[in-house]
Amino acid sequence: MGSVSSRGHRAEAQVVMMGLDSAGKTTLLYRLKGYQLVETLPTVGFNVEPLEEPGHVSLTLWDVGGQSQLRASWKDHLEGTDILVYVLDSTDEARLPEAVAELREVLDDPSVASVPLLVLANKQEVPQALSLPEIRDRLGLQGFLGRSWDLRACSALTGAGLPEALESLRSLLKSCSLCMAR
């Protein structure tokens, strides 16, 4: 992978999306690309898609499989990451402790020590979905000192919250002084 760089007038950034299986990472990836709903299968390995953003930013989105047997390889995808996106299934309260533990393990990796984090609380269209304050409390996001982060509600199914998620992604990228200095 690479880092934020400027080739000509276009900045490039590597965005890695992680989260437990069935959180909706692949559906989010293709919705961000502008596709309507697509049928997805569990990701074995990863999916990679470019996303041209207004403002001369070219994003490469890496959607890394979240099945338990694939998580050991997550660290292989962290080197050169400019923004880490962690996708949560807001309706799966039973697996939230597992999701939190996996997120903390990723964030402990030295290669992403200063990398900004965007947490996407997916499946917010479901009435029983956890609220953002509930998710914030359970993740302990306030404890991420020294790291730029944001938490956004979204729905890969309806597309709700995705424009705001992209705006947050852009803001985090701009705030990343280490990224911009590369």
Swiss-Prot record:
GO biological process: intracellular protein transport; vesicle-mediated transport
Segment forming the signal sequence: none
Protein species of origin: Bos taurus
Binding residues annotated for GTP, in chain numbering: 19-26, 63-67, 122-125
Lipidated residue numbers (N-myristoyl glycine): 2
Record keywords, A-Z: GTP-binding, Lipoprotein, Myristate, Nucleotide-binding
Annotated family: Belongs to the small GTPase superfamily. Arf family.
Protein role: May play a role in apoptosis. May act as a tumor suppressor.
PANTHER family named in the record: ADP RIBOSYLATION FACTOR-RELATED
InterPro entries to which the protein is assigned, alphabetical: P-loop_NTPase, Small_GTP-bd, Small_GTPase_ARF, Small_GTPase_ARF/SAR
Name this protein carries in UniProt: ADP-ribosylation factor-like protein 11
Cellular component per GO, a single term: plasma membrane
GO molecular function: GTP binding; GTPase activity
Coiled-coil region(s): none
Native organism taxonomy: Eukaryota, Metazoa, Chordata, Craniata, Vertebrata
